[in-house]
Amino acid sequence: MPDNRLTSHLTTQTSLTDAINSWEAFLSDKGRSPNTIKAFLSDVRLLTSFLPADTTLGKITTKDLNRYFEWMENERAVPCSPKTLARRITATKSLFRWLHQYGVLMVDPAEKVAQRSAISPLPQVLTSEEYDAVLLAADRHRRGSKPDARSYALVYLLLTTGIKKSETLGLKLEHVDLETPNGPQIFIRYASPANRYKERKLILPDDWIPAYNEYLSQYHPTEQVFPWSPRRLEYLLEDIGNEAGLTKHLSFDMCRWTCALKDYRAGEEPDKIRQKLGVSKIQWRELHNKLKQLSGM
C-alpha cells in the first residue's frame, strides 16, 4: 500500500491549493530536484487562477480541465507554445493521478484529458566533413606554440560519448577510469535518486586518452574534470566551431545528437544508443524517430 501520510488530511472538500502544497512535499520526498518541483508547481498553480476560488477537489471535472487547456492554448493573453502546453498537461495529469492513486479522488478527472504533441524541430548535427573540421580545429591548439589540449579533450569527449552539458559539468576526476579491463571509461553519476536511471558507464576512445593526459598536465584540475562555468565551456565550443568554418552554432546539444546519429548510422542497436544517452524508454520514442529522420537526410 502507498504511504498516504501526505494525503491523509486531504478530501474531496479540500482546496486545490492545499492539495498542491501536499504534492510539493510528496515530490520532495521522492527526490525530485528543486528545479523540477518548481516547474511542476508553476504549471499546476495556473489552474487555481482559472477555476473559481471556492472550487474543491471533488468538483473538478474532465470538462473543467479541457476548458482550462483550451483557454491556455487559444484565449490566454500570454502565448503558450506547444511544448509548454504539453508540459503543463503532463504536470496536471501527474497531480491528479497522485490524488487518485492515494485515494483522495475516486475518479481521476485528468485521465481522459488528451495529451498534446510537443514534437520539436529536428536538431542540427555535424556532417562528416564538419565533424573532421571541428576535431582538426581543436587539435591545432594542441600543436601550437603554447600547447593547449582543453578544447580537444572537451569536444572529442562530447562527440564520442554524447553526454549532456550538465553531465559534463558534473564529471569528476574520480569518474574517469583509464585502467578498467574493458578499456578506459567514464561513469556518469547523479546525486538525486530520481535520476539514478540516467547513471551509466561509457567507453572512451583510446585516442582521447593522450589529449586528456595532456590537458591534466596543463590545467591540473583537482575535482571537476572541467572546472569552468557552463557559459565558458559554451564559448569554447563556439570558438572551435568558428575556427572550423562552421555556419552552424557548435553546442553541447549538437555534439550529443551528432554522436547519437553517428552510432545509429553505424548500425548500433537502438536500445544501446538509448542507454548510452541515459534516456528513458518513453523519452527514447521521440529521439529514435528523429534519428530515423536525420539518418535519411
State where each predicted segment sits.
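N-terminal core-binding DNA-recognition domain of tyrosine recombinases/integrases
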Residues: 4-5, 21-35, 41-122, 141
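Alpha-helix N-cap/helix-start motif at helix boundaries, enriched for small hydrophobics
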Residues: 92, 154-155, 162, 166-171, ...
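A short, glycine-centered helix-capping/turn motif at helix boundaries
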Residues: 103, 157-170, 266-268, 277
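DNA breakage-rejoining catalytic core of tyrosine-based enzymes
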Residues: 105, 119-135, 195-206
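Basic, Lys/Arg- and aromatic-enriched nucleic-acid-binding interface segment
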Residues: 133-161, 165
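Short, basic (Lys/Arg/His-rich) helix/loop patches that form interaction surfaces
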Residues: 143, 222-224, 235-275, 279-280, ...
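Conserved tyrosine-mediated DNA breakage-rejoining catalytic core shared by Y-recombinases
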Residues: 170-208
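Active-site/catalytic core of tyrosine-dependent DNA strand-transfer enzymes
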Residues: 203-247
